[in-house]
């Protein structure tokens, strides 16, 4: 999807589509801890553990946001009021529609709407918005911090590393105080800040990742191995005979941030040319409509899995379920297109231009490292 600046990066849409698929598959596989695929199952191949723990797709979205905004705003002066207005036009219409649909669903089910709308109101600060809307809250908190983060990273290229270290120390302090930190690490900016920051840093050092196939493969293997261990140790829900130590959530967001940020920089710089083969076109379309797919899929993904399991074939086998999830995800792309066309696109036409040429940048060029003023590759 094109940004309001008119720039379009198909490789990043592929990554966005992958992130949506991870989250979709996680919910398809695990409508409940018992199935259709039992949560205690651990894939034999470590790479598949990332699918089994597909909640990590949210972290991939966050790292991509940091990278993309660093890329779009590199060497430019940003007018932040139009920027914030554009982000509201991008995110709020569909979120409002989802809130209304969920309210209707709960009303028809006889549930208390007072509690629901109280949670919606709290969603400005806390992760209480429905259907994945909690991650929009996290993104909004990132946008509020973005002016400061970009200014700091332009003055000192490795400033994001200092902020990541501060986030780790904050999570460590919360763990020492409360004995657990998973809630803050997964559901709030306290954990996802690492991914945004790593994305920003990855853009500025992206040349180090270009064409480094063996490095990318080593990171993928290491990250898959870690998630295989994490999955075997009970994963997100702490199920199984052994449970991962609760302190793992102090560093898990950082591990996700490092792996995803490097992967994004590698893919963006190494495979920037538009690809026209069918699988890439499908992922590109999925990426273009990923926001709609992400917010809407929870209305039907569990029912899809149950219908297939009850009426077509048994999907308790992890690998069979993943194939069905892939087919259902592709079938969901037209739903994303309709949502995008009818709900998102009309408001996107109202977006404002929020960048001015670098010549108007109030920060002297000499104050910035050379890599920070280079144009996107």
Place the predicted regions along the sequence by residue.
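Membrane-interface helix-loop-helix regions
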Residues: 40-53, 85, 91-141, 166-189, ...
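Extended basic-aromatic, gly/pro-enriched interface segments that bind polyanionic ligands
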Residues: 54-56, 60
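Loop-to-transmembrane-helix entry motif
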Residues: 87, 91, 95, 289-296
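Divalent metal-coordination and catalytic microenvironments
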Residues: 16, 66, 88, 139, ...
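Hydrophobic, membrane-inserted alpha-helices
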Residues: 142-148
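Central hydrophobic cores of alpha-helical transmembrane segments in multi-pass inner-membrane proteins
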Residues: 62-71
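Alpha-helical transmembrane segments in multi-pass integral membrane proteins
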Residues: 1-11, 21, 25-52, 70-82, ...
């Amino acid at each position: 999807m094109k940004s309001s600046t008119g720039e379009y990066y198909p490789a990043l849409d592929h990554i966005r589509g992958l992130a949506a698929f991870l989250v979709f598959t996680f919910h398809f596989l695990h409508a409940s801890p018992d199935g259709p695929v039992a949560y205690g199952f651990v894939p034999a191949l470590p790479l598949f553990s990332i699918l089994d723990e597909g909640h990590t797709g949210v972290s991939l979205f966050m790292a991509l946001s940091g990278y993309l905004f660093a890329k779009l705003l590199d060497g430019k002066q940003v007018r932040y009021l139009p920027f914030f207005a554009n982000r509201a036009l991008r995110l709020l219409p569909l979120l409002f529609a989802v809130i209304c649909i969920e309210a209707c669903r709960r009303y028809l089910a006889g549930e208390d709407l007072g509690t629901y709308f109280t949670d919606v109101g709290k969603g400005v600060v806390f992760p209480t918005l429905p259907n994945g809307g909690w991650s929009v809250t996290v993104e909004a908190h990132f946008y509020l911090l973005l002016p400061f983060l970009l200014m700091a990273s332009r003055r000192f290229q490795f400033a994001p590393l200092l902020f990541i270290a501060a986030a780790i120390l904050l999570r460590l302090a919360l763990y020492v105080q409360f004995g657990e930190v998973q809630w803050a690490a997964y559901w709030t900016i306290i954990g996802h800040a690492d991914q945004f920051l790593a994305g920003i840093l990855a853009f500025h050092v992206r040349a180090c990742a270009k064409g480094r196939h063996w490095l990318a493969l080593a990171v993928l293997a290491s990250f898959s191995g870690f998630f295989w261990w994490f999955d075997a140790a009970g994963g997100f829900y702490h199920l199984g005979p052994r449970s991962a130590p609760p302190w793992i959530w102090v560093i898990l967001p950082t591990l996700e941030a490092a792996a995803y940020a490097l992967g994004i920089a590698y893919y963006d710089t190494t495979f920037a040319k538009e690809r026209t083969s069918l699988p890439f076109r499908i992922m590109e379309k999925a990426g273009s409509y990923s926001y709609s797919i992400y917010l809407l899929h929870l209305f039907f993904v569990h029912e899809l899995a149950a219908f297939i399991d009850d009426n077509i074939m048994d999907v308790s086998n992890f690998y069979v379920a993943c194939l069905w999830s892939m087919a259902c995800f592709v079938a969901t792309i037209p739903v994303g297109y309709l949502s995008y066309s009818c709900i998102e696109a009309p408001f996107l036409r109202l977006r404002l231009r929020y960048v001015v040429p670098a010549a108007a940048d109030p920060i002297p060029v000499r104050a910035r490292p050379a890599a920070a003023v280079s144009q996107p590759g």
